[in-house]
Amino acid sequence: VYKRQSMDCCIVNRETLLEIIDHYQAADYLDLLEALQGDFGNIDVCSYEYKGEVVGVFSEKSLYRRSMDLLDQTVADQLFDPERPILTKAHDVPPSRYATGSHACNSIISAGCIIKGTVRNSILSRGVVVEEGASVTNSIINQSCIIKSGARVENAILDKNNVVPTNTELRGTPENILVLGKAPLTSDTTIVR
């Protein structure tokens, strides 16, 4: 419970979860929390008071804002507390490589990235390539994207496996983030939002 609001999170053992699913199988739609509060039987439901920060991510804009908050060291320290480690799937990739002449500042750059251009105030997932002469600013670039030479990405979220061709400009604004799904682009394209 956060400020007397449910965080809509619950922990249920597998056996109980399967019983709930079987019991409500005929319902067109039923939220797990609704089932726990419903007439399923006598389930012992307890709450846990969480005193840390809770943020909801319900839109592309909130995803962008909350992700970019991680660039603030205070926020990152709260989330990545060594006393509460976050365990994720390990990938066997080399560390990120920064070429001579590249520039990266105030960014989270995951393993396996190759940085030859400029990255500022951005979050790069595993395996992103930023070629020489390319720039990424205030953006979230997901797994295995390639930002080709001369391309410019600003205030954007790119889905994984996108290739931003040479001399392409993708630019949103802080209030109107550009979101690029899996979409092939051609060289010299400009998308401004």
What is the predicted function of each stretch?
Residues 1-2:
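Short, small-residue-biased leader/transition segments that mark boundaries at the very start
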Residues 25-193:
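Left-handed beta-helix
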Residues 8-20:
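Conserved nucleotide-sugar donor-binding
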